[in-house]
Amino acid sequence: MAQEIQKENNDHLVQSSDPEHPANLIPDLCRRFYNWGWVTGTGGGTSIRRDNHIFIAPSGVQKEMMKSDNIFVLEFPTPKYPPSDRKYIRKPLDLKPSACTPLFLAAFERGAGCCIHTHSQWAVLVTLLVEREKGPNAYFEISNIEQIKGIPRGKGKGMMGFYDTLRIPIIDNTAFEEDLTGSLEKAMEEYPDTYAVLVRRHGIYVWGDDVVKAKTQCESLDYLFQLAVEMHKLGLPWVKET
């Protein structure tokens, strides 16, 4: 009977000795993000698309304790709404799907291979500073910082340069994670070259063509956010005047 349940639940989709398999990468990434202070409690999330499968970290599991058998698997493409129409082909018993799922799907529909959601304190702080200094409709921007080179200009446009100005849109938070989807998609449309969207008083969504690009872009952005907070303390402008 146990073998039948395992077969019906497609557990083979998350069983692999390959460390680069999404079901192994997601728990590893979540542990790293926990250790870096990007996610606490059970907040945040990570998802990877491989061919026509999407692997997603679950809701309610401590990030540093996550295992490969905790991972959900969806067919891709799949409807974002209603949740009951999503094509799950593997569901861990006694776990809930991530509330980030429709936001991850929005990134995958635009060609992403990996999407990361963190609750980085530096990301939250820059959203508050931008709101106070520039108003609720402003975006985060910074220029003339070397680490900007770690961010793409846009799909097929290469990487940003030292003299470029990086702009990241900011959307307002909502009471429920899934309700952010519309605002996230609107920001993606208004900023078609962006690979990230900040969520005020909440965190950030970052995506990339693959796992390495999403992770390194997330690292570069977090560095820039921390630097921006420290620059603000010293009265230094984020965008250098020409």
Curated annotation (Swiss-Prot):
EC number per UniProt: 4.2.1.109
Keyword Transcription set for record: no
Bound cofactor: record note: Binds 1 zinc ion per subunit.
Enzyme class: lyase
Function: Catalyzes the dehydration of methylthioribulose-1-phosphate (MTRu-1-P) into 2,3-diketo-5-methylthiopentyl-1-phosphate (DK-MTP-1-P).
Family the UniProt entry places it in: Belongs to the aldolase class II family. MtnB subfamily.
Protein name per its UniProtKB record: Methylthioribulose-1-phosphate dehydratase
Binding site for Zn(2+): 117, 119, 202
Catalysed reactions, as listed in the record: 5-(methylsulfanyl)-D-ribulose 1-phosphate = 5-methylsulfanyl-2,3-dioxopentyl phosphate + H2O
GO terms for cellular component: cytoplasm
Known pathway: Amino-acid biosynthesis; L-methionine biosynthesis via salvage pathway; L-methionine from S-methyl-5-thio-alpha-D-ribose 1-phosphate: step 2/6
Protein localization: Cytoplasm
Coiled-coil blocks: none
GO molecular function: methylthioribulose 1-phosphate dehydratase activity; zinc ion binding
Reported cofactor(s): Zn(2+)
Annotated stretches, region: Disordered: 1-20
Disulfide bonds, paired cysteine numbers: none
Positions contributing to substrate binding: 100
Family annotation (InterPro entries): Aldolase_II/adducin_N, Aldolase_II/adducin_N_sf, MethylthioRu-1-P_deHdtase_MtnB, Salvage_MtnB_euk
A Pfam family assignment: Aldolase_II
Record has Membrane as a keyword: no
Active site location: 146 (proton donor/acceptor)
Keywords linked to the UniProt accession: Amino-acid biosynthesis, Cytoplasm, Lyase, Metal-binding, Methionine biosynthesis, Zinc
